[in-house]
Amino acid sequence: MATIHVDGKALEVNGADNLLQACLSLGLDIPYFCWHPALGSVGACRQCAVKQYTDENDTRGRIVMSCMTPASDGTWISIDDEESKAFRASVVEWLMTNHPHDCPVCEEGGHCHLQDMTVMTGHNERRYRFTKRTHQNQDLGPFIAHEMNRCIACYRCVRYYKDYAGGTDLGVYGAHDNVYFGRVEDGVLESEFSGNLTEVCPTGVFTDKTHSERYNRKWDMQFAPSICHGCSSGCNISPGERYGELRRIENRFNGSVNQYFLCDRGRFGYGYVNRKDRPRQPQLADGTKLGLDAALDKAADLLRGRTIVGIGSPRASLESNYGLRELVGAEYFYSGMEAGELARVRLALNVLNNSPLPVPTLRDIEDHDAVFVLGEDLTQTAARVALAVRQATKGKAEAMAEAMKVQPWLDAAVKNIGQHALYPLFIASLAETKLDDVAEECVHAAPADLARIGFAVAHAIDPSAPAVAGLDDEAQALAQRIADALVAAKRPLVVAGTSLADPALIEAAANIAKALKLREKNGSLSLVVPEANSLGLAMLGGESVDAALDAVISGKADAIVVLENDLYARVPAAKVDAALAAAKVVIVADHSKTATVDRAHLVLPAASFAEGDGTLVSQEGRAQRFFQVFDPQYLDSSIQIHEGWRWMHALRATLLNKPVDWTQLDHVTSACAEAAPQLAGIVNAAPSAAFRIKGMKLAREPLRYSGRTAMRANISVHEPRTPQDKDTAFAFSMEGYSGSAEPRQQVPFAWSPGWNSPQAWNKFQDEVGGHLRAGDPGVRLIESQGDRLNWFNAIPGAFNPARGIWTAVPFFHLFGSEESSSRAAPVQERIPAAYVALAKSEADRLGVNDGALLSLNVAGVALRLPLRINEELGAGLVALPKGLAGIPPAIFGASVEGLQEAAQ
């Protein structure tokens, strides 16, 4: 710690920070533009000027940029010095010479950092009366709108996009006061993290195009703390609603998880919530709409006296899955995961529970100095993990700078010292990945061969690990190099997962973790699982969806209740058809119109994450609560959307002719926690419904929320009472606590007086860029218990394909491989058409060129798909894009036959 003196007051700060960060962490206001907590300091904008003095006797001082000045012990500065204030005001005035006067029509208005800083400096009159420079805007795709005339040349966008996120297609062009930030030509931004430009940019150059179609100001939206359902990373989000529609998603700061950034699937994939074809009223197969009571009575009549299987879902909350389990009984509750996937998730859970190495948070991943990714294309399967791994490789430059006594926040100096030096990253994958540019070495092979390399790495680290027989010299040498790098590191990281449908990859990663622990390495093990609640569902229990369908087909059960799951996306259609035909009753509760919904005798409209509350468990084992953003019945009383657990419990009560016991979320959460030992901690994932600050509930709406009394004027001139939330500590109102002075974990939206932009998160943190003052949201359910794993010995044989027989393997796409986000219109523009990928050698042998139409038979399913030649894919492999339309599920690892050019 260090003592600095600010305007005569002695204050304790972190001496490793710069003055800007230190002062902001103290709650003091200094305007800034180019600095960002995740990007460091470059001193480009000159906005954060303060007066620095030699000591308490110095009355003259000198102006310095606070972001470029260390917070050294004994530093004397003044923020309120008149010369400094005049300097800061003049900087804003210079920026305004070319900035348009378009705040009323600018989509950044109301959450604009430039507006905040302009007000903070006191600039309120423009004296510049001459021609402004103008630019041509670009079409950057379906996610980002571009208005270059608003640029203030802070360089944040390119520093984030190129230096932080690793993008290559956004740059800066021009010179002096006429620079242009964009692409060489119009086109879709290629980075999977481009959406963060909308929050990184302090002005309205880059704005959310998905919000533009139905735009409103930030102060006119209703928010709630939520969790992204797009993958298993568990990123925290703030969805905003107006008039019963989700309008945008903003990043919600969690210092242990996503910090300041989201992937584009998580930010822009919310459109399925607003789809017109969603189930909104209970409906019979003939199209008859029912009310709430009639639907429950009908469902009870259909199910009474029958043996019911309940099929849950890894995209549904723990509470909803538990509600289904209580309805049908634990014996007849099924997880909803395909058999192979469930086995792999269970294996991952067992490994994490008993691993000798801890499970890292997303933020922890950034602090490792050697990484081995085994079998995962992280950018496509867990994008936010990929971004964290990219930051881990860049830690080498910071370490080199530290050795030269250069502060890590001096961004340009650190890069100059590092000269592109990176910590070692090794990637073993099917084909090329978006992280290859920062990898020391990459190897591409079949899943079995990747696993063999992993087992060989473990043996090279510790000879007591099982050896791999028949490994060729090249692979053995690679395994030795990977092992040497992991052992040489202070904090190595191993990342694997379930994606390639081969449990041997997880077992190999577990062996590496055990070997590293035996070498006394302070490492970590991270395992990627498929969906938002896959790990939580494995903790809750339940067999596979295959077993559920078998039970119906065999006559063991004659009724099916499906919760938030499309069975046709899990197992082959023929098996689903057989089970649904055998079932006397099929009831589906879901928030989206799926093929399974179309086959239901009764559909119950379930809440999406925006209309309900619940708990998810991320791949880290972190239980996190998501909260209802809005009540859909407020604007349309005919809507009967309810959380899955409410439907299930009400149906159970109707069947048993008993009163409803679970009247609020806390009741079902507590019951679920008691039923599954590993889920006992979920009650602590968020405050209870009784939580208050200064006697008030927490406001979902900003103080300036407008139009509430007029929103239903077209329905009735009589204003109803606002919805009452009995489930949580939040109010559907601006009436409640919304400030930053009182520490709290669950923050619906970031706002503080004078801070309307996302930079308002400064006011909620223990130190800027650190953690929330009340602690980061969520509770970890998995903590390392020491080494309780034995060596995994089932090492697969080498992949040796027979001529004319291929093996199907999955390629993943951030846009398209996840079910719900693929229903969002902007995301659909980014989803590729279905294809089949082959190695160049295989294409040559078949005599076909790129784009040729091929026919093939995989697991009994005939397909006709265009060819994509992949230079990195191994021989004997046929890659198919998982989740894309036309690609059947549960085929990966199966044999492919009849591969040939299709007859025209």
Swiss-Prot record:
Recorded GO CC terms: membrane
Record-annotated 4Fe-4S Mo/W bis-MGD-type domain positions: 221-277
Family annotation (SMART domains): Molybdop_Fe4S4, NADH-G_4Fe-4S_3
Enzyme class per UniProt: translocase
GO annotation, biological process: ATP synthesis coupled electron transport
Pfam families from the UniProt entry: Fer2_4, Fer4_Nqo3, Molybdop_Fe4S4, Molybdopterin, NADH-G_4Fe-4S_3
GO molecular function, a single term: metal ion binding
The keyword Iron appears for this protein: yes
Cofactor binding, note field: Binds 1 [2Fe-2S] cluster per subunit.
Binding site for [4Fe-4S] cluster 1: 99, 103, 106, 112
Domain (2Fe-2S ferredoxin-type) ranges: 1-83
Positions annotated to bind [4Fe-4S] cluster 2: 151, 154, 157, 201
EC code(s) of this entry: 7.1.1.-
Boundaries of every 4Fe-4S His(Cys)3-ligated-type domain copy: 83-122
Entry keyword set: 2Fe-2S, 4Fe-4S, Iron, Iron-sulfur, Metal-binding, NAD, Quinone, Translocase, Ubiquinone
Cofactors demanded by this protein: [2Fe-2S] cluster; [4Fe-4S] cluster
Residues that coordinate or bind [2Fe-2S] cluster: 34, 45, 48, 67
Catalytic activity from the UniProt record: a quinone + NADH + 5 H(+)(in) = a quinol + NAD(+) + 4 H(+)(out)
Function recorded in the entry: NDH-1 shuttles electrons from NADH, via FMN and iron-sulfur (Fe-S) centers, to quinones in the respiratory chain. The immediate electron acceptor for the enzyme in this species is believed to be ubiquinone. Couples the redox reaction to proton translocation (for every two electrons transferred, four hydrogen ions are translocated across the cytoplasmic membrane), and thus conserves the redox energy in a proton gradient.
Family: Belongs to the complex I 75 kDa subunit family.
Complex formation: Composed of 13 different subunits. Subunits NuoCD, E, F, and G constitute the peripheral sector of the complex.
Protein name: NADH-quinone oxidoreductase subunit G
Species this chain originates from: Pseudomonas putida (strain ATCC 47054 / DSM 6125 / CFBP 8728 / NCIMB 11950 / KT2440)
Annotated gene: nuoG
